[in-house]
Structures are given as C-alpha cells and as structure tokens.
Amino acid sequence: SRGLGDVYKRQPSQQDNLQDLIRTLRTSDAELGLAFDGDGDRLGVVTQEGEIIYPDRLLMLLSEDVLSRCPGGVVVYDIKCTRLLAPWIKNKGGQPVLSRTGHSYIKGAMQREKALIAGEMSGHLFFSERWFGFDDGLYAGARILEILSKSQDISKRLHALPQLQSTPEITLTLKEEGRNHEIIKQLQKNPNFPGAENIITLDGLRVEYKDGFGLVRASNTTPSLVLRFEGKDQDTLQRIKEVFYSALSSFVPDLDHYFSLSSPINHM
C-alpha cells in the first residue's frame, strides 16, 4: 500500500486545508492521505477517492481496535463529535465520556477517567494504551495504518464507519472581546429550542433532538462563537439550523452571511 503525507499550519481536519492532498490522491496510485499540522500533534485523513474521514469517525476506528484488547475501557471525546460516537463506543464494549473542547480539558478528562484513548474534532488524538497519554499526529497516523493494513480495501473500511449529514465548524467572529461568553450565558439562562430532547451545557449549548443536534459554544482562544449541526438528512439539518438562527439572531448581526457558509459536508 502507498500513502501520501502533507503538513498544514492550520487545522488538518478542515475541508479547505485538505484540497491539495485530495487533488494529489486523485492523480496518484496512493491508497490513503495523511495530513498534519505544523507541530505534528493533529491528524487529518483522506481516502483515495477524496473522502475526508473526520476525527470523530477516526475515533470510532481507533476505539474499536483499542477496546478489542481492553474491554470496558473509557473513551473521551469532545462536545463537537457526532452523536453516533457514544453508542458506537458502548456497542464495542467501552464507556464513552463527553468532555469540553480544548487540549487541556481533553487531557484532564483522560487522566481523571483513566481513559485508554481520547480525541476531539480538531484532530488531536490521545493514547494511553501502548503510548504515553499525549497527542501525537504521527503516532495516531501509525495506529490507523496498523489497523488498515489488515483490510483488503482501505477506502471501503473507512467509508463503512457510520455518519450522518453534518456541517463543518462555523465560526461567528464578534468585534467585542468577551461578548461570546456573554451570549452563551444568556442562551443558557433562557434557552429557547423547541422540540429539544436534551440541552447539554458542559461547553456552550449542545441541543439534542431525536434526529440530530446543534451546538453553539464560545471559542477558548478568540472572540467568536463556534457552531456545528448534524441531522439524519438534509431536511433535518436545515430545520435545526433554522432553530439556532432564530436563537442567535438577536445577538449576532449578519447571520445570513455565516449560515450561507454552512453548507453540509459532502458525504460520498
């Protein structure tokens, strides 16, 4: 098997940052593409056909492998991950633990829970099983290659990992420092999300519906709000986006611009 690697200064899990790698894969005989950020602690993965395997799905692949050796183990994942991840971990004999987004929060939860593996949507993947408990993109890539080396068809194996319709992260940049945290406090104080089955306030608001979820949280590093949406189909995705549009419209001007950028991820 052959693979291609690429290094990016920005997040290697973001669609825009992977286009060069996707083009190269389509014009070569490589079976897999790996992307790393500048300091090598984050990983992105692309199939031969150009399908991006986002980090929450990579965590499915990795946790299944780890739990086959360590049944009952804990797997930590961040608030932005797919709703399919927790039941996947349980089905494979593990214990899912939800964490706030952020390197220090994930690492802290991993240590508290004595987790075997942890990951977040930014592409940080942590291993304590057969490793030292920190995030290392090169090592995560090696673990993925180890698993995929047992498959006759790498793309088929990765494509089989379950997924729903979803958007990439949407970043709403605000002019005033601290305004993002004020908005989250107001939304948590007076949540208005019709039809919600559950509202998780661990990190912003993750509003769970029977057929999807919407998330809005304050960035830890910039004066911005970060959103992500997931649904069983396009209609569900649009419905959840519209609910969040209504909830945020009194706080953030020019929402139309941001929501026009939130086209669904291209699921192949």
PLM regions and their residue ranges:
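Short, small-residue-biased leader/transition segments that mark boundaries at the very start
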Residues: 1-8
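Alpha-helix C-terminal capping/helix-to-coil transition sites in glycosyltransferase folds
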Residues: 3, 27-29, 112
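Gly/Ser/Thr-rich beta-alpha loop segments that engage phosphate groups in nucleotides
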Residues: 5, 40, 52, 121, ...
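N-terminal phosphate-binding loop and adjacent alpha-helix
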Residues: 9-22, 188
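Alpha-helix N-cap and loop-to-helix initiation/capping positions
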Residues: 12-16, 51-54, 136
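Phosphate-binding and adjacent anionic-ligand microenvironments
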Residues: 32, 70-268
